[in-house]
């Protein structure tokens, strides 16, 4: 627990010990993914309540499931996404309840805490709250650069101090992959699509006037198109 990302490791190892029981692993993994996707949806609907796009909230978790099909990916990555969605939901709630000073204070506390307990997913969180504030046009949204800069400083100090061997471990997904595995672009899709989905929910406000069946078509076409473009060449184990 004293190591960076130690809580994610502790939780994942605690859960994995029960996976030898039939169906437990699948059920626990599905439950974690379901909760994470639901929490992300609660944040997305604050951007715009586009119910027909709700399935997209689970797209980042879908990629996490694909990563877990590879022996080189750690279960900590899925646990980290759960806490990312939880922290993002907490922040989005506070952004509406408090003024920009308290919002920035919360934003400065959550990324380092997430970094220490869950690892490099904190950089995704810092980018997510910045994008959320921009899309919501929050009061003094530019103050959200402060948590990002703070995390960049903390992460850099960890690398310079020897706590982490490389910047990929603090600012990218290498923290959740075996050290001897080359980090493929495929591993970044989960984080990238999370930010993309936030942007799509913002843009969906311009589609409110179209018919319901066209909205449903959009909800189906977007994830299918994305997976078709990215998966075929990236699923080799």
Give residue spans per PLM region:
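Conserved small/polar residues in nucleotide/adenosyl-binding loops
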Residues: 227-233
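Membrane-interface micro-motifs in multi-pass membrane enzymes
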Residues: 2-5, 29, 52-98, 116-122, ...
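Membrane-interfacial interhelical loops
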Residues: 1-18, 63-73, 155-188
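Transmembrane-helix motifs of polytopic, lipid-linked glycan transferases
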Residues: 30-47, 85-90
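Loop-to-helix entry region of an early transmembrane alpha helix in multi-pass inner-membrane enzymes
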Residues: 19-34
């Amino acid at each position: 627990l004293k190591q960076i990302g130690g809580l994610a490791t502790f939780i994942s190892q605690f859960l994995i010990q029960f996976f030898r029981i039939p169906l437990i692993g699948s059920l626990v993994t599905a439950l974690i993914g379901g909760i994470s996707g639901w929490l992300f949806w609660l944040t997305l609907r604050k951007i715009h309540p586009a119910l027909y796009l709700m399935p997209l909230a689970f797209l980042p978790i879908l990629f996490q499931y694909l990563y877990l099909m590879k022996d080189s990916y750690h279960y900590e990555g899925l646990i980290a996404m759960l806490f990312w969605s939880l922290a993002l939901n907490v922040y989005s709630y506070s952004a509406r309840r408090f003024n920009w000073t308290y919002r920035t204070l919360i934003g400065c506390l959550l990324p380092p805490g997430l970094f220490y307990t869950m690892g490099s997913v904190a950089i995704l969180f810092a980018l997510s709250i910045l994008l959320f504030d921009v899309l919501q046009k929050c009061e003094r949204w530019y103050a959200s650069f402060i948590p990002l800069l703070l995390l960049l400083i903390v992460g850099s100090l960890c690398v310079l101090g020897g706590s982490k061997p490389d910047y990929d471990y603090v600012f990218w997904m290498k923290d959740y992959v075996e050290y001897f595995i080359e980090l493929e672009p495929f591993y970044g899709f989960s984080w990238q699509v999370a930010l993309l989905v936030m942007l799509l929910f913002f843009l969906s406000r311009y589609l409110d006037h179209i018919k319901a069946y066209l909205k449903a078509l959009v909800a189906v076409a977007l994830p299918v198109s994305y997976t078709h473009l990215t998966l075929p060449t990236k699923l080799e184990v």
